[in-house]
Amino acid sequence: MSEEKKQKLTGINFRDVSTCESTIQMLQKVADDGFETAFTRAADMKPCPIGADSACCKHCFMGPCRLNPKDPYTKTGVCGATIDTVAARNFARMVASGGAAHTDHGMSMLDMFREVVKGNIKGYKITDEVKLRNVATSIGIAVADRTTEEIAMDLYNELERTYTQVEGEIPFAKRVPPKTLETWRKAGIVPRGAMREIMELMHRSHMGVDQDYENIVKQCSRTALADGWGGSMVATEISDIIFGTPTPKVAGVNMGFLKEDHVNIIVHGHEPLLF
């Protein structure tokens, strides 16, 4: 390891990035051993000052266009976008990408749920029938005198609209507190369907489509709600129904829980289908 690289890796005070003593010790050991982490790479990265203020646009091939955050309204991008529009477009693309990630995760969980209900997947089962009935009831599905399989299939068909519906309101909008839902309706941000909202946000943030930053940000709100009250909520509820609703447990945590004389298996992530 060169002296320059060693200085970059070991010249960081890891107490500035964590309050956890064991994490600080491990970060220091990794650096001393000559390996990079996100923290050392971040310290070595000098952010672009224009990009840091979201004043750079590269959504089309007439650019990239750089605007001056210190003198923001003296010029526009080639397409005529102001700095407000550029910032809104940049933020919109991040909202769309994050929403798509949660939406796809939720769809995977829902696809698995359908196959479990149909009996095509034998390794999983409906573990929490009470949660199944509560979720079904919350969105208007009848549960009295019906089998678990009947309720589950109706729940699948209803929740599928979270993703595929192109008009109306997503199913879990029925769970939103009435005053909050009224506010959303007045603002025009109740999600129709996750795919529709993400697609429209990508469309609006494209060059030559929507130059009004307020319109773009409004669609950001609708897409974010499609994520939180759609894709993410579906994933959470289906996970609980299949794997069981979490309950408080006493567990060991942190680096100090690893045992030197054991084979330690570390599970990372939130995709329960893999486990």
Which sequence ranges carry the predicted segments?
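Metallocofactor- and cofactor-centric catalytic cores in central/energy metabolism, strongly enriched
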Residues: 2-275
